[in-house]
């Protein structure tokens, strides 16, 4: 199973934002245990860096440590001109969400995990909340006989 994390989920995990952190950490734990694949767009890392360091004043050493940890478990998907043009040419209300969608599509993600599922309603990759993700992962674990 391959999950594409939207920027808000990555930020929730890195900043340990409540009440979202526990669910985000649980999703990450599945990747650490090699049960699933997680991908995040390069755009999300740029935005997350800005939010965490510039807006929230997270010390850069702490931010770098968290990113270094994630590097082992997350596939970074590229954003290319096709994603940009497709997002502009499509009917996406939010340009950034469109870019994320096209990056997830090229990565062959099964789901987009986001706190804003309504932003991704009309596409062929199902957008799910963190709570829905946990339910799906528990069923996935049962079906694959993983403890």
PLM-predicted stretches and their roles:
Residues 1-40, 55-58, 122, 134-147:
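Short, well-structured N-terminal submotif of metal-dependent ribonuclease cores
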Residues 2, 73, 105-147:
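Acidic, PIN/NYN-like endoribonuclease modules and their adjacent C-terminal/linker elements
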Residues 8-9, 43, 82, 118, ...:
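Alpha-helix/helix-capping structural signal
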Residues 16, 42-44, 68-91:
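Acidic catalytic patch
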Residues 49, 53, 85-88:
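Amphipathic alpha-helical segments within well-ordered protein domains
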Residues 50-78:
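Helix-adjacent hinge/juxtasegments
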Residues 93-96:
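Glycine-rich anion/phosphate-binding loops
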Residues 100:
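Short active-site alpha-helical segment characteristic of glycosyltransferases
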């Amino acid at each position: 199973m391959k999950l594409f994390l939207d920027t808000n989920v990555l930020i929730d995990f890195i900043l340990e934002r409540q009440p979202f952190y526990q669910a985000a950490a649980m999703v990450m734990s599945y990747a650490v245990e090699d049960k699933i694949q997680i991908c995040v767009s390069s755009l999300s890392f740029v935005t997350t860096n800005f939010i965490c360091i510039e807006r929230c004043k997270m010390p850069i050493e702490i931010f770098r440590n968290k990113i270094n940890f994630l590097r082992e478990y997350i596939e970074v998907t590229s954003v290319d001109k096709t994603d940009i043009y497709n997002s502009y040419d499509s009917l996406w209300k939010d340009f950034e969400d469109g870019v994320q969608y096209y990056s997830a599509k090229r990565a062959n993600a099964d789901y987009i995990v986001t706190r804003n599922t309504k932003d991704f309603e009309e596409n062929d990759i199902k957008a799910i909340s963190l709570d829905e993700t946990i339910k799906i992962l528990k069923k996935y674990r049962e079906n694959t006989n993983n403890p």
